[in-house]
Amino acid sequence: MKKSILFIFLSVLSFSPFAQDAKPAGSSKEKITLESKKCNIVKKNNESSPESMNSSNYCCELCCNPACTGCY
């Protein structure tokens, strides 16, 4: 019984702010800038491609990650 209580206490304590570092290990004061990437791809007009996909979506999927902010 004492071992189980000790185990529960230690597991709860590990999630407390005292057990966590106050400063993240990879933190630095260096500024990071995102570079915009312009895609120069012309979409071919195929009948097999869906009409709902516009050229900017097509460009973003091919050149960079769609979640990236620099895609336009």
Curated annotation (Swiss-Prot):
Entry keyword set: Disulfide bond, Enterotoxin, Secreted, Signal, Toxin, Virulence
UniProt keyword annotation of Disulfide bond present: yes
Family membership: Belongs to the heat-stable enterotoxin family.
Cysteine pairings via disulfide bonds: C59-C64, C60-C68, C63-C71
Name assigned to this protein: Heat-stable enterotoxin A2
GO molecular function: toxin activity
A Pfam family: Enterotoxin_ST
Function: Toxin which activates the particulate form of guanylate cyclase and increases cyclic GMP levels within the host intestinal epithelial cells.
Signal peptide location: 1-19
Keyword Lipoprotein: no
GO cellular component: extracellular space
Superkingdom per UniProt: Bacteria
Compartments it resides in: Secreted
